[in-house]
């Protein structure tokens, strides 16, 4: 036995037998040694053992052939040739921006989940009322976020050109205009709140409508604070400082949970305010966050964006305002129309019963958690693209957007497919109602099935907006939202009786149309139409003079 083992060792030490070519020999030698170690209980001539050994050898060889073929395919790709530069891009450009944004969004969503937990203990009607009111609040927040995006792009572009003054003016004027607009908007919505809830709630019960109206009237008071927090955070991100928004928004959401919990359920001998405490706690925490943003800008924590309180009363510069609005208005039209269409689909769901409303709300909350890395990469792509184009690096902007897109596609698909089997477990954190959990499980599995096209639908347009190509995204969103999500969702969900599954299939049809059109835009390079590439200089041949 020792002689055979030493022979095998000398054979494998030969430099000819390198990985993976040595593995079939190693497998054969191990099988032979196993025959001798058994104290001759099994003869080497035993035919079943020989057949089994040969079968395993063939399996190993076929697996090695497949792995070798895959390795050759990977080595022949463009990614493998530039893998070192992509690694540098990931760690130096993407990670410092995307990770704090991811943590900030995760904190916001997780605190939203905890807020839902706080309300869920008050009953299904309370949870459905919050869901209906928040579906309208999301329309307003989407508008603020779009102006925030315009501010982010202008700040990133201006600082790319080393123009700090323009970045400060853009931030200051965006804060002033959007705060005034938020006050006006809050007044109008508070006055017409009952009509808005009747329109949004559809066939919901009277109790659900009353709770939704109460929550809406309390949360509209926080609109000015939400506008200040969103736009100030966007300006800081455009300046490359993503840690301060993370700290402020994270602290804001933790305060929201603490304050709302105390106001809902009371403290010590005080019984609390019940359902009213949920909306009041959110409003108080948002104003604390707005004060923190204004303080950070006033003390100049980021030197590029030092804005004193007196400067908010200076005259407005309309040239910079129109530059911000040139990106913000198309993006806001896109966001408002998108969220309005989403609100309309919520109305389809509102007539399907309280269990379906609650299950749909929970499924959207879980899907938002799954999409967090993609949302962070989308925000990072906006900043990276704006910076690169600000210094005239057009080719780098194109390469980096492609890299972010594929990174998001592969990462989100893996996350969605790995978390889908645990949909029931995640739903149990929200509710113990079996009907609601059944709805959540079905919707999360559908979300995982269509996740490979999500990044093309959402990450790519975020990068396009960094190149100030916002109008194309606006028209595509209008077409896909109203032509697919609303129409297909109504046909499948209401007319054909598919229920909430049909409404979600309309959403996936919206994703598919957006993915095709945005991917075509990226491949053709038309999203860089505002940045013409310099034409290569032609070398003119000098005429030969004959003597």
Swiss-Prot record:
Protein origin, superkingdom: Bacteria
The UniProt record lists the keyword rRNA processing: no
Membrane topology classification: Multi-pass membrane protein
A Pfam family hit: MatE
GO MF annotation list: antiporter activity; dipeptide transmembrane transporter activity; FAD transmembrane transporter activity; FMN transmembrane transporter activity; xenobiotic transmembrane transporter activity
Subcellular location, record wording: Cell inner membrane
A Gene Ontology term for the protein's cellular component: plasma membrane
Parts of the chain that traverse the membrane: 94-114, 139-159, 174-194, 211-231, 246-268, 281-301, 318-338, 350-370, 404-424, 439-459, 486-506
One GO-annotated biological process of the protein: FAD transmembrane transport
Annotated keywords: Cell inner membrane, Cell membrane, FAD, Flavoprotein, FMN, Membrane, Peptide transport, Protein transport, Transmembrane, Transmembrane helix, Transport
Known function: A transporter able to export peptides and flavins. When overexpressed allows cells deleted for multiple peptidases (pepA, pepB, pepD and pepN) to grow in the presence of dipeptides Ala-Gln or Gly-Tyr which otherwise inhibit growth. Cells overexpressing this protein have decreased intracellular levels of Ala-Gln dipeptide, and in a system that produces the Ala-Gln dipeptide, overproduction of this protein increases its export.
Similarity-based family: Belongs to the multi antimicrobial extrusion (MATE) (TC 2.A.66.1) family.
PANTHER family, per database record: FMN_FAD EXPORTER YEEO-RELATED, MULTIDRUG RESISTANCE PROTEIN NORM-RELATED
Name of the protein in question: Probable FMN/FAD exporter YeeO
Organism of this sequence: Escherichia coli (strain K12)
Gene it is expressed from: yeeO
